[in-house]
């Protein structure tokens, strides 16, 4: 499957590498051209600008943003202005869930799906996979399932396949409508940080 990745920091770059290893076509862009060049050498297709990235994607397009939360809404709006009905924007950063709800509502009249994905796995995700907490329209999430399945850890040897459990045993879950993915990630982070603080006081 083809996907565009914007933001090639440690997590974004490693997510591209994981997708390339599993046969996906990745079109990549970053303000730092060196980050783009490094992934082109590993098999990705480089883009010189956001517009170039969009031009190199086939409809229906999917653009995944791995950016700091402070700039994500601005960049998402810039992409939405250039995308078409049926395309999707995925926010895999640590954005506030209410912003995801607002952006989804803003883009919906344009026919553009906005999917928020809480992404957990850090720099180890390249080998171990990423736990994904997904919010957004059912049809759009289903269309992107091959991407989510490739990024996720997989069931592992000790978890029996059970269709009734859906994708959860494989490390990714459609949590609900817009905002649900980032809301669940916020809860996840709160628990994680609470445990770390508690252990520090032991």
Show the residue positions of the predicted features.
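Rossmann-fold NAD(P) dinucleotide-binding segment
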Residues: 50-114
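Rossmann-fold dinucleotide-binding core
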Residues: 3, 76-77, 96-201
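Structural detector of well-ordered beta-strand residues that form the stable sheet scaffold
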Residues: 27, 47, 89-90, 115, ...
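Small/polar loops that bind or transfer phosphate-bearing groups
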Residues: 7, 28, 64-67, 91-92, ...
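NAD(P)+-binding Rossmann beta1-loop-alpha1 motif at the extreme N-terminus of oxidoreductases
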Residues: 1-62, 86, 123-126
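A short linear boundary/processing microfeature
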Residues: 42-45, 69, 81-82, 150, ...
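Short loop/turn and capping residues at structural boundaries
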Residues: 30, 50-51, 93-94, 118, ...
């Amino acid at each position: 499957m083809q996907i565009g990745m914007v933001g090639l920091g440690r997590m974004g770059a490693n997510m591209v590498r994981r997708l390339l290893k599993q046969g996906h076509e990745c079109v990549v862009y970053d303000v730092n051209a060196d980050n783009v060049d490094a992934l082109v050498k590993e098999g990705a297709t480089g883009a010189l600008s956001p517009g170039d990235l969009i031009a190199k994607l086939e409809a229906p397009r999917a653009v995944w943003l791995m950016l700091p939360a402070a700039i994500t809404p601005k960049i998402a709006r810039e992409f939405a202005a250039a995308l078409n009905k049926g395309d999707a924007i995925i926010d895999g950063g640590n954005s506030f869930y209410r912003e995801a709800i607002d952006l989804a509502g803003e883009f919906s009249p344009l026919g553009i799906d906005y999917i928020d994905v809480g992404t957990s796995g850090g720099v180890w995700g390249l080998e171990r996979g990423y736990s994904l907490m997904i919010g957004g329209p059912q049809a759009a999430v289903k269309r992107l399932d091959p991407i989510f399945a490739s990024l996720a850890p997989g069931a592992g040897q000790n978890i029996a396949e059970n269709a009734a459990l859906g994708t959860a045993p494989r490390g990714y879950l459609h949590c609900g409508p817009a905002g649900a993915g980032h809301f669940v990630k916020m809860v996840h982070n709160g628990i994680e940080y609470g445990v770390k603080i508690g252990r520090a006081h032991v």
